[in-house]
């Protein structure tokens, strides 16, 4: 089957029997958050996007309840943002109030929690990593800062309680608002125990690498990463 070109930002269901995506038609009333079978059949519109497509992160939760985060909640002031959790049947679950702007997130493997990065005045608008409850009935509970200045998409879970992150060696003030302008800043690698919140430096690469993606082996003995500079 051929997937329409205006379908973008795909996320697979936990059993890989469905996809969530943004259907971005030319007209605002033809833009939707939607689901379908992996071959594109049986598509179903979930929520209208209008001109808010850039505020929606498609991310199907491991517990099969949430398919996207939407930064379209009620205004909360300069240093806070309300993020909505959207269900696969259009449910608007309990929202998440985050301490900053530029929300990026990742689910824990069991879907119980999310890690996310935001930037605020308290961090000089550098990205800061947080963890919070992620289930529809616990969204935002136990929210706490992990204490690392990096983005959620530079992290990967080793288990439900272990996180590995690439952390830029240096970040200018304001970097969280303009991540594309950071360039090829080299990273160090950290391991985070999510039970205690302790972050440990585990590697300073011999050569300077800018990590774009981390892959953790099943036994957590090895980390593999894609280097943004070389593409390898």
Q: What are these model-predicted stretches?
A:
Residues 24, 71-77, 119, 166-184:
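Short, conserved, GDST-rich strand-edge loop motifs in beta-rich repeat architectures
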Residues 115-116, 125-133, 159:
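Alpha-helical transmembrane segments and terminal signal-anchor/GPI-anchor hydrophobic tails
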Residues 4-22, 48-67, 93-117, 143-164, ...:
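Conserved beta-propeller blade repeats
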Residues 34-39, 82-89, 128-135, 183-196:
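Beta-propeller blade signature
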Residues 170, 175-231:
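C-terminal closing repeat unit and adjoining cap/tail of repeat-based domains
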Residues 39-44, 89-94, 136-142, 196-200:
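Beta-strand initiation motifs
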Residues 1, 72, 81-89, 126-128, ...:
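Short, intrinsically disordered, charge-balanced linker/junction segments flanking boundaries
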Residues 62-68, 73-97:
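Acidic, glycine-rich loop-and-beta core segments that form the ion-binding/anion-interacting portion
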């Amino acid at each position: 089957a051929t997937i329409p070109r205006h379908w973008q930002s795909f996320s697979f269901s936990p059993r890989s029997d469905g996809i969530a995506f943004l259907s971005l038609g030319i007209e605002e009333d033809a833009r939707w958050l939607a689901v379908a079978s992996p071959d594109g059949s049986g598509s179903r519109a979930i929520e209208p996007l209008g001109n808010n497509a850039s505020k929606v992160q498609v991310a199907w939760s491991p517990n099969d309840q949430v398919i996207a985060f939407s930064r379209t909640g009620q205004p909360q002031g300069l240093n806070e943002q309300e993020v909505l959790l959207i269900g696969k049947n259009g449910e608007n679950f309990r929202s998440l109030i985050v301490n900053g702007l530029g929300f990026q997130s990742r689910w824990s493997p069991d879907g119980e929690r999310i890690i996310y990065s935001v930037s605020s005045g308290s961090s000089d608008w550098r990205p800061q990593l947080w963890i919070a409850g992620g289930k529809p009935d616990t969204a935002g509970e136990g929210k706490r800062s992990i204490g690392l200045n990096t983005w959620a998409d530079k992290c990967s879970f080793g288990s439900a309680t272990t996180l590995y992150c690439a952390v830029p060696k240096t970040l200018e003030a304001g970097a969280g608002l303009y991540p594309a302008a950071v360039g090829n800043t080299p990273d160090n690698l950290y391991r985070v125990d999510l039970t205690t919140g302790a972050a440990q430096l585990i590697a300073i690469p011999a050569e300077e690498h800018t990590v774009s993606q981390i892959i953790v082996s099943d036994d957590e003995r090895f980390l593999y990463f894609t280097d943004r500079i070389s593409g390898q």
